[in-house]
Amino acid sequence: MFETEHHTLLPLLLLPSLLSLLLFLILLKRRNRKTRFNLPPGKSGWPFLGETIGYLKPYTATTLGDFMQQHVSKYGKIYRSNLFGEPTIVSADAGLNRFILQNEGRLFECSYPRSIGGILGKWSMLVLVGDMHRDMRSISLNFLSHARLRTILLKDVERHTLFVLDSWQQNSIFSAQDEAKKFTFNLMAKHIMSMDPGEEETEQLKKEYVTFMKGVVSAPLNLPGTAYHKALQSRATILKFIERKMEERKLDIKEEDQEEEEVKTEDEAEMSKSDHVRKQRTDDDLLGWVLKHSNLSTEQILDLILSLLFAGHETSSVAIALAIFFLQACPKAVEELREEHLEIARAKKELGESELNWDDYKKMDFTQCVINETLRLGNVVRFLHRKALKDVRYKGYDIPSGWKVLPVISAVHLDNSRYDQPNLFNPWRWQQQNNGASSSGSGSFSTWGNNYMPFGGGPRLCAGSELAKLEMAVFIHHLVLKFNWELAEDDKPFAFPFVDFPNGLPIRVSRIL
């Protein structure tokens, strides 16, 4: 009996010694690593949590926030920390940020927290890396091609803009942020799954999506009643909806293929209207294109569509809300915008035209300055998640393999050594920068290299960047021609770190007669 008790107690007696040995080995490893690497200055903060709580503390979106400001002042533009439970190199350095993004897949790799993949899906473009990300991105670029931007997308961007603006009543007060979300969601739902604005199924999907989004930006606690738990439930509902659309579309494509086999050229002219609409739908939206031209699995298609709804709707709506906010405080910019767009409208009237075309878009020079400044000052995407694939040395500092790396885009955009009075909304700074530079075919301007990266860079440059700028330009065109607006109550954008208006950006509008 004594011998049995002795064997039972032995592991318990050895446990403190084993834990002490483990702690010693961890400390020894850390000491060796510090000796081996010349790490940037900084500190790790609390065990496990590190400095994450301070880093994520909300702050005014047009500033760096106390955490970044204090750390950059104390340690410089490259420092080390412990964020999201991992040792991290934080970069407010423009050159390092560009170096990180340009070396995607070679020295660095996209590495978002697991909770993001858990809610967006493992096949989401945001979390994919390597060949699979390249293939998914290729599909998105095809969907957002220059030819489609100039024709189908431009036409529908204007149609959906007017759908929203024409609902605004004289002297009414409403959330500009919600209206911007309505515009971008309706547009993406139309071009991804041919869903029309105002329809019951569109409104129901939008309602589920709002619940889903609250979970994406919440703490990943999968407990009943939490935002994350509700978001996972909404995700399941949204995926069932998309899958039902997929099955309907497969039947449409099958019928279309059968008709092409049976009907000859002379009979195609007599194709019924419903057949024509069905064929146009299977050709024009993303769901139809993916089903007809890719070999993606059902799970991959579901995650792709969900992630495109997220990426194509959320960030663009925030950018439009920011433009509305900045412009209401800058009457001079609104006046110059109005002159630019009145000139375009007069020229169209003389030609007997009403709808905007690509030539009109290319004439929106000052509008592009406003867009550039909105994205620079508002910083819709403030930082990116990356991981070092190899030991990397930069400016004498070492970035160890496996460490997380956070290129903080907003820190460069708000750097007073790179922008004069960076916390002020000044769209004219872009006219000064681009003096003598010609606009590109997309209406965008040459920018300040490393200093301006609102859409990221490198192989993961945002696939929807040109669509986002087109949406903003067309929305601004009709906004300044149709309305004056002002804040109905105090509000301003905060970084949580996602950018949001706490009160929804309530505005009062009056029509221009």
Curated annotation (Swiss-Prot):
Q: Where in the body, by tissue, does this protein show up?
A: Expressed in stems, leaves, shoots, and roots, with a higher expression in siliques and apical shoots.
Where located?
Answer: Membrane
Transmembrane annotation, as ranges: 8-28
Record-given protein name: Steroid (22S)-hydroxylase
Write out the pathway annotation from the protein's UniProt entry. Plant hormone biosynthesis; brassinosteroid biosynthesis
> What InterPro entries does its record include?
Cyt_P450, Cyt_P450_CS, Cyt_P450_E_grp-I, Cyt_P450_sf
Q: Which organism is it from?
A: Arabidopsis thaliana
Q: Which positions does UniProt annotate for heme binding?
A: C462
What keywords were assigned to this record? Brassinosteroid biosynthesis, Heme, Iron, Lipid biosynthesis, Lipid metabolism, Membrane, Metal-binding, Monooxygenase, Oxidoreductase, Steroid biosynthesis, Transmembrane, Transmembrane helix
Membrane topology annotation: Single-pass membrane protein
**One term of GO molecular function:** iron ion binding
Answer yes or no on keyword Lipid biosynthesis.
yes
**Annotated segments matching region Disordered:** 252-277
The top EC class is: oxidoreductase
Specify the superkingdom.
Eukaryota
Q: Which reaction does it catalyse?
A: a C27-steroid + reduced [NADPH--hemoprotein reductase] + O2 = a (22S)-22-hydroxy C27-steroid + oxidized [NADPH--hemoprotein reductase] + H2O + H(+); a C28-steroid + reduced [NADPH--hemoprotein reductase] + O2 = a (22S)-22-hydroxy C28-steroid + oxidized [NADPH--hemoprotein reductase] + H2O + H(+); a C29-steroid + reduced [NADPH--hemoprotein reductase] + O2 = a (22S)-22-hydroxy C29-steroid + oxidized [NADPH--hemoprotein reductase] + H2O + H(+); cholesterol + reduced [NADPH--hemoprotein reductase] + O2 = (22S)-22-hydroxycholesterol + oxidized [NADPH--hemoprotein reductase] + H2O + H(+)
